[in-house]
Amino acid sequence: SAFELQNKTQEPLTGRKFEFHLFPLTYRELANHSQELMEQRLLNHRLVFGSYPEVINNQGNEIEVLKLLADSFLYRDLLMLENIKKPEKLVKLLQALAYQIGQEVSYNEVGNTIGLDSKTVETYIQLLEKSFVVFRLPSFSRNLRNELKALKKIYFYDNGIRNALIASFQLLEGRQDIGALWENYLVSERRKKNFYQRFYGNSYFWRTKEKQEIDYLEEADGGLKAYEFKWKEKAKHRISKTFRNAYPNSEMALIHSGNYDSFLH
């Protein structure tokens, strides 16, 4: 696992240091391998089962493979290597985070739910970040008093792992969490894309106390790009007027299932 490799390679290096991350396969890698139209046809499958190579190469056995990945990598490796004192709490934390993708996460609230103090929750989340299971997205705040400043959203690097944690593998049609799966997929894919393409800007979400929000922001070279995510191609949605007035020079776009390819290339 990534965390095991990290533990084994802590020796200091002289000179320049390069850091390499191996994520689940990206949209671009899969599209280049099997042609873009074919990959787009598999979008529903990716939202449920993710993009780990083991899953891609074992069609028909996705659930079994994901359960093995979760059991061996998340539970056994993490619990063994970090010597976690309350392993059952880490499992509950992962499940709580899986149910909250696309939502602001309060360490206090999560801790109260699973029986841990907020500091321990944060420590466990940092461990999960080091092992490339989840990552945090901070809130953006510059101009307005009513912008949320302290909360963070937490996303999984892979939708399949998220679904494995809560044993939720039903087909996309009829699911109540399509919006959350779509947001997690887009944000995680964009994160992988930006890393591989050496994008050195910052990423955020934006929300006010009145619950006006922007799903995803990127800030680079003095510019700001705002993105709203909607699953349905014909969904009508306007970027928050409050945001537009506060940041009038921002670029703004709606990303849906009919145009997402340009967002991930």
Feature roles, as predicted:
Residues 108-112:
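A short acidic, leucine-rich amphipathic alpha-helix
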Residues 16, 37, 117, 197, ...:
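Secondary-structure boundary/capping positions in well-ordered alpha/beta enzyme cores
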Residues 1-106:
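Interdomain motor-coupling "hinge/lid" segment immediately C-terminal to the ATP-binding subdomain
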Residues 126-127, 133, 138-265:
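A cross-kingdom feature that marks ATP-driven nucleic-acid transaction machinery
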Residues 116-130:
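Short amphipathic alpha-helical interaction segments
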Residues 56-64, 83-87, 100, 114-118, ...:
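Conserved phosphate/pyrophosphate-binding and hydrolysis machinery centered on Walker-type P-loop NTPases
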